[in-house]
């Protein structure tokens, strides 16, 4: 685990604990998702927030103006990050926090690679089958197009890969023939 992810993980876990204690897990989840989208959409704001020439107080004022409508506890958390010069971790913290929420809810993210876009019915069927395999209640599936697969699908859930693509089957056959 990289040091950045380790640091972000500690902050995300602490925030998650506070959210559970205050029954704000879903509120923080929504607000962090919106906050991350805003940070991704406005790189100039991120540059200002991470600019070392700005004082802590200036950064807090900037954050206060931009994040005025978020939950006060979450705003205080952002101030804490600024105080500790960790504002550049905000996006990663949001990701780790969301993973904790998903773990709590029994939800996992899955990337499904196919040659053509899959229908809603196909995605639902894959979700049902692989959610059961992973002991999850639900999978959030992202369908990616990969023409190199030739056919079939490849499902990636965390570190697990289920490859039922024609490309892999042909490679397996080639290996068996050469053996």
UniProtKB/Swiss-Prot annotation:
<dbReference type="InterPro" id="IPR026015">
    <property type="entry name" value="ATP_synth_OSCP/delta_N_sf"/>
</dbReference>
<dbReference type="InterPro" id="IPR000711">
    <property type="entry name" value="ATPase_OSCP/dsu"/>
</dbReference>
<keyword id="KW-1003">Cell membrane</keyword>
<comment type="function">
    <text>F(1)F(0) ATP synthase produces ATP from ADP in the presence of a proton or sodium gradient. F-type ATPases consist of two structural domains, F(1) containing the extramembraneous catalytic core and F(0) containing the membrane proton channel, linked together by a central stalk and a peripheral stalk. During catalysis, ATP synthesis in the catalytic domain of F(1) is coupled via a rotary mechanism of the central stalk subunits to proton translocation.</text>
</comment>
<keyword id="KW-0375">Hydrogen ion transport</keyword>
<comment type="subunit">
    <text>F-type ATPases have 2 components, F(1) - the catalytic core - and F(0) - the membrane proton channel. F(1) has five subunits: alpha(3), beta(3), gamma(1), delta(1), epsilon(1). F(0) has three main subunits: a(1), b(2) and c(10-14). The alpha and beta chains form an alternating ring which encloses part of the gamma chain. F(1) is attached to F(0) by a central stalk formed by the gamma and epsilon chains, while a peripheral stalk is formed by the delta and b chains.</text>
</comment>
<comment type="similarity">
    <text>Belongs to the ATPase delta chain family.</text>
</comment>
<protein>
    <recommendedName>
        <fullName>ATP synthase subunit delta</fullName>
    </recommendedName>
</protein>
<dbReference type="GO" id="GO:0005886">
    <property type="term" value="C:plasma membrane"/>
</dbReference>
<keyword id="KW-0139">CF(1)</keyword>
<keyword id="KW-0472">Membrane</keyword>
<keyword id="KW-0066">ATP synthesis</keyword>
<keyword id="KW-0406">Ion transport</keyword>
<keyword id="KW-0813">Transport</keyword>
<comment type="function">
    <text>This protein is part of the stalk that links CF(0) to CF(1). It either transmits conformational changes from CF(0) to CF(1) or is implicated in proton conduction.</text>
</comment>
<dbReference type="GO" id="GO:0045259">
    <property type="term" value="C:proton-transporting ATP synthase complex"/>
</dbReference>
<dbReference type="Pfam" id="PF00213">
    <property type="entry name" value="OSCP"/>
</dbReference>
<dbReference type="GO" id="GO:0046933">
    <property type="term" value="F:proton-transporting ATP synthase activity, rotational mechanism"/>
</dbReference>
């Amino acid at each position: 685990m990289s040091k950045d992810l380790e640091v972000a993980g500690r902050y995300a876990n602490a925030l998650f604990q506070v959210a559970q204690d205050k029954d704000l897990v879903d509120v923080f989840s929504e607000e962090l998702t919106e906050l991350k989208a805003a940070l991704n959409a406005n790189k100039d704001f991120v540059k200002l927030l991470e600019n070392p020439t700005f004082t802590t107080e200036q950064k807090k004022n900037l954050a206060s103006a931009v994040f005025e409508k978020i939950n006060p506890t979450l705003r205080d958390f952002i101030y804490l990050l600024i105080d500790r010069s960790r504002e550049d971790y905000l996006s990663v913290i949001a990701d780790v926090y969301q993973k904790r929420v998903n773990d709590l809810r029994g939800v996992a993210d899955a990337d499904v690679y196919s040659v053509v876009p899959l229908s809603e019915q196909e995605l639902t069927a894959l979700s049902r089958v692989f959610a059961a395999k992973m002991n999850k209640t639900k999978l959030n599936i992202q369908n990616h197009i990969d023409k190199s697969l030739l056919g079939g699908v490849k499902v990636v859930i965390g570190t697990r890969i289920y490859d039922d693509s024609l490309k892999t089957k042909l490679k397996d056959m080639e290996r068996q023939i050469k053996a």
